[in-house]
């Protein structure tokens, strides 16, 4: 059998089994879709961190190993932390899986799962996602080495937007923007 047909069937079998699972991708993106530099966020936006905590608490979060390594205190509390890694099999406070499909298969088919980065995991998860929860930052970073994948406006509809100006805690204008898949 042709390998591409088997992969295609496997993909649709996985989707059929997980049709009720709600997968959200959450990220803070600059105007050029940059998300990080040297495994660090580009901008310090306390309200973005509050929104992240509010949305993800009580849910499963899936991330790559580098994203896990970037967390100052390790696994995030009050969430099921799932890490994708082919080289590490154990991390404190987290479950480790070799690939996204296996990680998603370990989740309940009725739960909401948040994909929290990084670049490679976002790219892998985008075809499965139901919602994008983006913080769109009105800035172009001087340096960036990680980017959010491009997504087609014909596949996504803006469902929420909340704009914020600069203030004493936020040096950049930003907007919380949610998109849902058509």
Features from the language model and the residues they span:
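Extreme N-terminal starter segment of soluble prokaryotic enzymes
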Residues: 20-25
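Flexible, gly/pro- and Lys/Arg-enriched active-site loops
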Residues: 27-60, 65-182
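Short hydrophobic alpha-helical segments enriched in small aliphatic residues
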Residues: 3-6
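Aromatic (phenylalanine/tyrosine) cluster motif
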Residues: 8-14
